[in-house]
């Protein structure tokens, strides 16, 4: 039972972090010029990396 609560809390935290990353990304200054070489990380990329990492962590905790 406690592991399900921990799992639910971790999923909620991952969604919250992903949402906040999207909001922070949208509130940033205008994008640099294409010739500057600076690349911004999209919120979908952050979510694509964060969600499997949380799932892997939770999978290791359950064992």
Curated annotation (Swiss-Prot):
Membrane as a keyword? yes
Q: Which residues form the signal peptide?
A: 1-26
Topology in the lipid bilayer: Lipid-anchor; GPI-anchor
Which InterPro entries does the protein's record reference?
A: AGP3/12/13/14/21 (IPR039281)
Q: Name one GO cellular component term.
A: aleurone grain membrane
Lipid (GPI-anchor amidated serine) attached at which positions? 36
Q: Where in the cell is it found?
A: Vacuole, Aleurone grain membrane
Q: How is it modified after translation?
A: O-glycosylated on hydroxyprolines; noncontiguous hydroxylproline residues are glycosylated with arabinogalactan.
State which tissues express it.
Expressed in roots, stems, leaves, flowers and seeds.
Keywords of the record: Glycoprotein, GPI-anchor, Hydroxylation, Lipoprotein, Membrane, Proteoglycan, Signal, Vacuole
Q: Which domain of life is it from?
A: Eukaryota
What protein name is recorded for this chain?
A: Arabinogalactan peptide 3
């Amino acid at each position: 039972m406690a592991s399900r609560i921990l799992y639910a809390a971790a999923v909620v935290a991952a969604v919250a972090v992903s949402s906040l990353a999207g909001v922070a990304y949208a509130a940033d200054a205008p994008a640099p010029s294409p010739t500057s070489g600076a690349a911004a990380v999209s919120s979908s990329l952050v979510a694509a990396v964060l969600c499997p990492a949380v799932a892997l962590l939770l999978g290791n905790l359950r064992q």
